[in-house]
Amino acid sequence: MRLIFMGSPDFSVPVLEALHAHHEVVCVYCQPPRPAGRGKKDRPTPVQTRAEELGLPVRHPTSLRTPEAQAEFAALGAEAAVVVAYGLILPQPILDAPERGCLNIHASLLPRWRGAAPIHRAILAGDEETGICIMQMEAGLDTGPVLMCEKTHIGPEETVQDLHDRLSDMGARLILGALGALDDLVPCPQPDAGVTYAEKIAKAEAGIDWTRPATEIDRQIRGLSPFPGAWTLLNGERVKLLRCRLAEGHGAPGAVLGGLTIACGTGAVEITLAQREGKRPMEPEEFLRGFPLPEGSRAHTS
C-alpha cells in the first residue's frame, strides 16, 4: 500500500520500520530538528534519523494549515497516512487527502486516556491493563472510531520505559494487521462513557511526598521513569528514583529503613534504581557504596 508516515519520537520508529518493510512509504512527516543537549545544537527527531537511514524522503513543516502544505501532502497520492505521536494537529484537508484517510496508533484503550501522555497516566492511575488502538482519525482529539484494539497487562514493576517499548512493538504489529484487513474492518464508535484525558506530564508532579501511601509512591516512581524522573532529597542532594517495588516496613514517612528501602505514609518502597545529579543510574549496592545512607536518614522534598 502507498503510505505517508507521520511520527516523531522513539515510540514511532518501530512502526516506520515495519511499514517500510511491508509497504511503500512515499514520504515521512516529523517534527523539525530542535536545539538539544549541552551545546543546544539542532537535533533531528528519532524518526527523521531513521527515515534518512532508510533512504526515505522527509518533510518537517511547522504547520499543516497552509494551502501550500496541504497541496504538497495531497500531491503524494497516498492511499492512507499512518500517524503515531506526530506532534501536530491534522486539519480536515489533511485528514481527507489520502484515499482511505489517516489511521492513528494510540497507546491506550480508548476512550480512556485520550491525549498526550497515555502511558504515564495509565501507570500513575494504577491501571492494571492498557493497550493499543488503531483509530480512524477525525477532527476531535483521539475521538475517532476504533478499527482494531489489543490489550496488555501492566506488570507490577513496569516503568513507563518498559511499557513504552512493549506498546511500540505492539503498535507496529497491529498496524500491519489493520492495513492488511482494512476492507473487512468495521469502525467501532467510541462510547461516551469512560472518557479520560492524559494531560502532558508536568515537572511539578515529580517531587515525592513521603506522607502518601506506598502504593501511590510506587506508581509515581514507575509512572515518571525515565522522564521527568520522580525525585527526593537525600543528604541534601536531589536524587532521581527510577525503579522500585513495594516492600515490607514501617517508619516515619521518608525514613530510610535500611539499604534503599524508604518508609511511606503507609508501607514502604524499595528503590531498585537511583540516579544522583550528574551520575548514571545505579542499582542499590553500587549507589550506596558512593553515597552511604545510615539507617534513620530521611528522604524529603523541601
Curated annotation (Swiss-Prot):
UniProt-annotated stretches for the region Disordered: 279-302
Catalytic activity: L-methionyl-tRNA(fMet) + (6R)-10-formyltetrahydrofolate = N-formyl-L-methionyl-tRNA(fMet) + (6S)-5,6,7,8-tetrahydrofolate + H(+)
Signal peptide: none
Record InterPro entries: Fmt (IPR005794), Formyl_trans_C (IPR005793), Formyl_transf_N (IPR002376), Formyl_transf_N_sf (IPR036477), Formyl_transferase-like_C_sf (IPR011034), GART_AS (IPR001555), Met-tRNA-FMT_C (IPR044135), Met-tRNA-FMT_N (IPR041711)
Pfam families with a match to the protein in the record: Formyl_trans_C, Formyl_trans_N
Domain of life assignment: Bacteria
Biased composition, class Basic and acidic residues, residue ranges: 279-288
A GO term from the CC aspect: cytosol
Residues where (6S)-5,6,7,8-tetrahydrofolate binds: S108, L109, L110, P111
Listed GO MF terms: methionyl-tRNA formyltransferase activity
E.C. no: 2.1.2.9
Gene3D superfamilies noted in UniProt: 3.40.50.12230
Keywords: Protein biosynthesis, Transferase
Family in the record: Belongs to the Fmt family.
Function: Attaches a formyl group to the free amino group of methionyl-tRNA(fMet). The formyl group appears to play a dual role in the initiator identity of N-formylmethionyl-tRNA by promoting its recognition by IF2 and preventing the misappropriation of this tRNA by the elongation apparatus.
Protein name (record): Methionyl-tRNA formyltransferase
Species in which this protein is naturally found: Cereibacter sphaeroides (strain ATCC 17023 / DSM 158 / JCM 6121 / CCUG 31486 / LMG 2827 / NBRC 12203 / NCIMB 8253 / ATH 2.4.1.) (Rhodobacter sphaeroides)
Gene (name only): fmt
